Amino acid sequence: MSSEKTNQSWGGRFSEPVDAFVARFTASVEFDKRLYRHDIMGSIAHASMLAKVGVLTDAERDAIEGGLKQIQGEIEAGQFDWRVDLEDVHMNIEARLTDRIGVTGKKLHTGRSRNDQVATDIRLWLRDEIDVILAEITRLQQGLLGLAEAEADTIMPGFTHLQTAQPVTFGHHLLAWFEMLSRDYERLVDCRKRTNRMPLGSAALAGTTYPIQREITAELLGFDAVGGNSLDGVSDRDFAIEFCAAASLAMMHLSRFSEELVLWTSAQFQFIDLPDRFCTGSSIMPQKKNPDVPELVRGKTGRVFGALTGLLTLMKGQPLAYNKDNQEDKEPLFDAADTLRDSLRAFADMVPAIKPKREIMREAALRGFSTATDLADYLVRKGLPFRDCHEIVGHAVKYGVHSGKDLAEMSLDELRQFSDQIDDDVFAVLTLEGSVGARDHIGGTAPNQVRAAVARGRELLSAR
């Protein structure tokens, strides 16, 4: 048996180095090095706690803290040499700390395992990412409110089955996206609460024999509470899965919004125009102006769905406690957070710049018998049962299809052939303005309700 010594931190039990390919295969430093700031933050807090309980001297704590801050400076200046043979962000930083301050650096890991260390790092990182994402959601919602207020009176067709259904205002339509994003915001705030529980102190899986005071470390790191079970502390990735689930819902909303923007910018709809800075052209077709931002967001949604599925699959077969499988938690989590953050940023920049083509929207709303329900409701107010009214208006629509006339274009005599309850006052009901204005209740499309909803939305955002 070879007596060649391994240089790994755990190498005492081993009699030969790790195979070179296996070292590269099992290393995570190429992707987990982005946790460096949170790893250093956690280590400084851990060292401070160890000094408070007497495991480290104050001088040792100061040396560790000073060395770690210098290392952070090296990393941010691009002067840090990341080594694959040291496996991960934790051992790279610890090895460099020992190089800088000597044997004291080897004391940092007292009472701690990489198992609880990485679980803490990820939670710290995700907490910060959620805060950035929440700010981007708010910025997008502010843009939606501004555009909705400006377009509170702009009438467009509302759709079901992508067929003309009833007139709505463009402002009302935009506020539907505001509502979805509000739910996304709430979900992420809720996810942050469960993310912000500290596993540090769980050590490898059973806790530690040192007289640690976890509450001290938690307070230094801004955690709301400490985890109540060491086995769960090192093995739990629910918070990452929950984030990816919330991110998937948010991306699904952005994808649906993207689909509408793609449709609305097409020559077949022409409802809106996007500024050139949010579009690209074609290498062969000179006339093209492609809505690449919404198309790409629609496409990137699948990445986030994949991250959620990947993490669920990663965790479903693992026994307690920590397993090497969990190394695979970071890349999907990182990618999901990056994708959601960047997609929200793109939309927050783009939405306020949308230019509606009001006349085209209005003309589209005039087609497709969009006020048919209003005519049925009119007859109900005349005393007829709704089901009878539905049938009467259905016959009127059929007549309009064959005659090439929308309901508002028919004469009173033409309309009265379907019901003698129809009178001159029907024409006020059949206008687009009459249709949207009649839906004058909370959540309705009437322009004054749109403005009231915008005001409520601004109150909501200001309270965050």
UniProtKB/Swiss-Prot annotation:
Q: Which gene encodes it?
A: argH
| Protein name, as recorded | Argininosuccinate lyase
A single GO molecular-function term is: argininosuccinate lyase activity
EC number assigned by the record: 4.3.2.1
Alphabetized NCBIfam families for the sequence: argH (TIGR00838)
InterPro entries assigned: Arg_succ_lyase_C (IPR029419), Argininosuccinate_lyase (IPR009049), Fumarase/histidase_N (IPR024083), Fumarate_lyase_CS (IPR020557), Fumarate_lyase_fam (IPR000362), Fumarate_lyase_N (IPR022761), L-Aspartase-like (IPR008948)
The record's family statement is: Belongs to the lyase 1 family. Argininosuccinate lyase subfamily.
The alphabetized UniProt keywords are: Amino-acid biosynthesis, Arginine biosynthesis, Cytoplasm, Lyase
Q: What is catalyzed by this enzyme? A: 2-(N(omega)-L-arginino)succinate = fumarate + L-arginine
Q: Write down the HAMAP family for this protein, in alphabetical order.
A: Arg_succ_lyase
For this record, an example GO cellular component is:
cytosol
- What pathway does the UniProt record associate with this protein? Amino-acid biosynthesis; L-arginine biosynthesis; L-arginine from L-ornithine and carbamoyl phosphate: step 3/3
Coiled coil (UniProt feature): none
| BP GO annotations | arginine biosynthetic process via ornithine; L-arginine biosynthetic process
Q: Which organism is it from?
A: Ectopseudomonas mendocina (strain ymp)
The record's subcellular locations are: Cytoplasm
Is Membrane given among the entry's keywords? no
